[in-house]
Amino acid sequence: MVAWLWKVLVGVGLSALAHAAFSAAQHRSHTRLAEMKYEPLPTDIVLQTLLAFALTCYGVVHTAGDFRDRDATSELKNVTFDTLRNRPSFYVFQHSGSSLLQPSDTTRSSNLNVPSSDDIRLKF
């Protein structure tokens, strides 16, 4: 079928779902105002909801297009071993562990005679 027809089918299904929800809310409001005991939803609202849901799902499945294969070998052909497990979202540049690697004040006070790397300048 034509692609736009599936989108129209989704639209019709969603509007039918909205209408069924409105009908259910209106039925509940009516039973409250009439001070009736709890009554289940009428059969036509339940059937409309189920039919609209099925129609919407059917349209969405066809609108989504072709599914990709689960076999990832075609995508992994051009990937090197170094980039295979590369996850940039796990990169941490400033973490609290760097403070553990710095020397404490006691070791720094004992090495006061040794010039630090900031004091040494290269002359060319």
From Swiss-Prot:
Localisation: Golgi apparatus membrane; Early endosome membrane
Cytoplasmic side: 1, 66-124
Domain of life of the source: Eukaryota
Pfam families per record: MMgT (PF10270)
Family membership noted in the UniProt record: Belongs to the membrane magnesium transporter (TC 1.A.67) family.
Gene Ontology cellular component annotations, sorted alphabetically: early endosome; early endosome membrane; EMC complex; Golgi apparatus; Golgi membrane; plasma membrane
Function: Mediates Mg(2+) transport.
Lumenal topological segments: 23-44
Membrane topology value: Multi-pass membrane protein
A Gene Ontology biological process term: magnesium ion transport
Name this protein carries in UniProt: Membrane magnesium transporter 2
Alphabetized UniProt keyword annotations: Endosome, Golgi apparatus, Magnesium, Membrane, Transmembrane, Transmembrane helix, Transport
